[in-house]
Amino acid sequence: MAKNNNIVIVFDFDKTIIDVDSDNWVVDELGFTDLFNQLLPTMPWNSLMNRMMKELHDHGKTIEEIKQVLRRIPIHPRVIPAIKSAHALGCELRIVSDANTLFIETIIEHLGIGEFFSEINTNPGLVDEQGRLIVSPYHDFTKSSHGCSRCPPNMCKGLIIDRIQASLTKEGKTSKMIYLGDGAGDYCPSLGLKAEDYMMPRKNFPVWDLISQNPMLVKATVRDWTDGEDMERILMEIINEIMSSEEGEENDKMLSSENCKISVGIVHEPIQVPLNLVK
């Protein structure tokens, strides 16, 4: 792996790394779409997915059947090379997603990209003793609210980005962040990015629409993308821009340092005075 270049790339998962919503994919592929649509207006999404996992279990669907469905989920062929290239260039990669741990880990392990991510922030998805998947909220809203009116009750991605930024600062890192997402839940974190960061919203998706309503609210440089090929190209361009900028700053520092040494050398060099001028 290349030397760390102080770039942190945060990926949403559904419709960003993969081409579909993993929750909908499992429900549809296992034949529970009608029940899902019936229950959708009655509860938050996270609670609904936990209920759907109970329904799957009650109807005899196993965890292995769920995993088999997840392993055939569609992904654009250029997304995996983009992830591998970014990692090889020294970027730190993280996932922030409103899916769940079992879905994400099953998919990225199957795709062979699990090792490239240093952190996955998502809703816990754990299998109980009866073999049923329990999907819990990332933030337990039954005990307290996370306080963000923009985000669903179980997860504020903006707070997660704030925590990541704070941890990087505590470690003394001056990292630049690149955030990629598609959904309305990715809007809140876009507002927390700094001027030196980059926001990559998927064009004509909810987060792109929200940003387009008032672009001045986002301090970061916004570069939209349409598909995996577009994502790879733009992501590599941004990484190269940041690395070139950092190399230029480093060269400027070295040049400034050399100039300083030369200047000091001239000032302190003994002056040879002709003897006939000595009084």
From Swiss-Prot:
Write the record's keywords in alphabetical order, separated by commas: Hydrolase, Magnesium, Metal-binding
Q: Which reaction does it catalyse?
A: diphosphate + H2O = 2 phosphate + H(+)
Q: Which cofactor does it need?
A: Mg(2+)
Which Pfam families does the record match to this protein? Put_Phosphatase (PF06888)
GO MF annotations in UniProt: inorganic diphosphate phosphatase activity; metal ion binding; phosphocholine phosphatase activity; phosphoethanolamine phosphatase activity
Name the top EC class: hydrolase
Binding of Mg(2+): at which residues? 12, 14, 182
Active site per the UniProt annotation? 12 (nucleophile), 14 (proton donor)
Which amino acid positions bind substrate, per UniProt?
23, 98
GO BP, sorted A to Z: protein tetramerization
In short, the EC number is 3.6.1.1
What does this protein do, in the record's words? Catalyzes the specific cleavage of pyrophosphate.
Partners and quaternary state? Tetramer.
**Entry similarity comment:** Belongs to the HAD-like hydrolase superfamily.
Name of the protein in its database record: Inorganic pyrophosphatase 2
* Organism for this UniProt entry: Arabidopsis thaliana (Mouse-ear cress)
